[in-house]
């Protein structure tokens, strides 16, 4: 396996710059996931690594070799797409070995590689079937097998699970994670689904508008986001954002904020660089960090809109004022109220986040 390094990578279409100076290092054997909303540039960046898109400026190296102008077939990469792209008239065995046959590899070596990949992917019993006789998950495993037999330095996955139903996506996430451990492969993976990113990645690259917002381990991004975009994108359900204003400062960098929708709900938070009195800020609270009424550092009242019961966990959708919705996660079937009920929850300063007017985290 090889490391991948991107140095000030940029991509423009005419005067429109879509990738804006990306710097990133993917270590050998690392599983890195590009995640972000549609149009953020994640697939374009992946295609630039693959050689399917030209690099306008910057430097791309794979295994220490500059690859900017190297033909895609000579970059030592294998790519798995959202569409399986299997040949319908070929069997699983023939599909997996096609690229090797096309390259003129010896028949016995092709057979050895195909059989080894089939064993890893548990496709042994399906080798003589054609794609129409396979499920969606099986077809995707064949597509992955076709990449494995090439023994690439780097695997590139472009939203490979998007065409699968929810149950199959969960199953294939487990399969891909297992595959990464077995092969110790360098993988760069693109998805819009932050759950995929959280469950698969060693390192997540959060993108927006062609720039990298933050890079880090999944739980590091969840626990310590740099800005409101990352805080809201990583985590499901998303973080609650409550507009507030700074109403007081104290020694030691502590500030007291009051929620705009509920001025009586006030919270004192310690900050290394405290904002000034009167500054507009936003308090961030994850759904699972709301506490039972009467506990925490302050209380917040809201009116229930909807309660979703998911077995042992419930999600309460409520509003503090019209148009300002919050989501409360409740465990152990705590009573979440019914439509129109007024409920109270506690908020702890230790589990709350503070953001300035630009959306940047105040630490």
Swiss-Prot record:
- Enumerate the NCBIfam families for this protein: PRK11650.1 (NF008653)
Query: Where does it live in the cell?
Result: Cell inner membrane
Source organism = Rhizobium radiobacter
Its domain of life reads: Bacteria
Q: Which GO terms describe its molecular function?
A: ABC-type maltose transporter activity; ATP binding; ATP hydrolysis activity
Q: Provide the family line.
A: Belongs to the ABC transporter superfamily.
A Pfam family hit? ABC_tran
Give the principal location in a single coarse category.
membrane
Q: What is this protein called?
A: Lactose transport ATP-binding protein LacK
